[in-house]
């Protein structure tokens, strides 16, 4: 079985593995279910100051990461991971979803280009057929946090990461799962009564048919209230 391997291009290599070195992802890393290497873009910087950015042609605010610097670092990454698919976290990109995550895993070799400043030179995207990917309609300081987020999602989907792989079928957004791509139902555990709030009686009934019906109804109601666009295909 091929493992997931991620090559990460960044100016902050110390940010990795970060949260991915803990909990499920960290355990999976220790089991060699996935692996990673980090390339410091600044190692390919220009002059003794290791410059990696410059002013934008046409004016505008902020600095742009230079294509010659990025090109050298990407060439190095491709030498290490030659068959990899390359992704650039960007607000212009295709929105990352659970189904997109499964699509990404068709290639277990991935490169993530973490941008900084105002962004990267467009010619880099064109030259290397880089796929832009967005984690939402908001702006972050760089691509490192989106990369950590995307990798966390991908790692959870790998066989052997979750103790019970069936857990995936009862989670939000799983199109083939219990809630058909909608949001997960409300969850309860002990104590049965907490601060005068009781667990719904149906969950204590032992009647699996009624419990399943309640869960599906809850999922539909929550999805309709909070993410109605997810119901269009249900």
Curated annotation (Swiss-Prot):
Q: What InterPro entries does its record include?
A: Alpha/beta_knot_MTases, tRNA_m1G_MeTrfase_C_sf, tRNA_m1G_MeTrfase_TrmD, tRNA_m1G_MTases_N, tRNA_MeTrfase_TRMD/TRM10
NCBIfam families given in the database record? PRK00026.1 (NF000648), trmD (TIGR00088)
Encoding gene per record = trmD
Q: What is this protein called?
A: tRNA (guanine-N(1)-)-methyltransferase
| A GO CC term attached to the entry | cytosol
What is the E.C. number? 2.1.1.228
**Where S-adenosyl-L-methionine is bound, by residue?**
115, 135-140
Keyword Endoplasmic reticulum (UniProt): no
Report the family membership. Answer: Belongs to the RNA methyltransferase TrmD family.
Q: Which Gene3D superfamilies does the UniProt record give?
A: 3.40.1280.10, tRNA(m1g37)methyltransferase, domain 2
Specify the enzyme's EC class, one word: transferase
SUPFAM superfamilies hit by this protein: alpha/beta knot (SSF75217)
Gene Ontology MF term list: tRNA (guanine(37)-N1)-methyltransferase activity
Under the subunit heading, UniProt states: Homodimer.
Task performed by this protein: Specifically methylates guanosine-37 in various tRNAs.
Record's subcellular location: Cytoplasm
Gene Ontology biological process terms in this record: tRNA N1-guanine methylation
- In its UniProt entry, the species of origin is given as Rickettsia rickettsii (strain Sheila Smith)
UniProt keywords, alphabetically = Cytoplasm, Methyltransferase, S-adenosyl-L-methionine, Transferase, tRNA processing
Q: Which reaction does it catalyse?
A: guanosine(37) in tRNA + S-adenosyl-L-methionine = N(1)-methylguanosine(37) in tRNA + S-adenosyl-L-homocysteine + H(+)
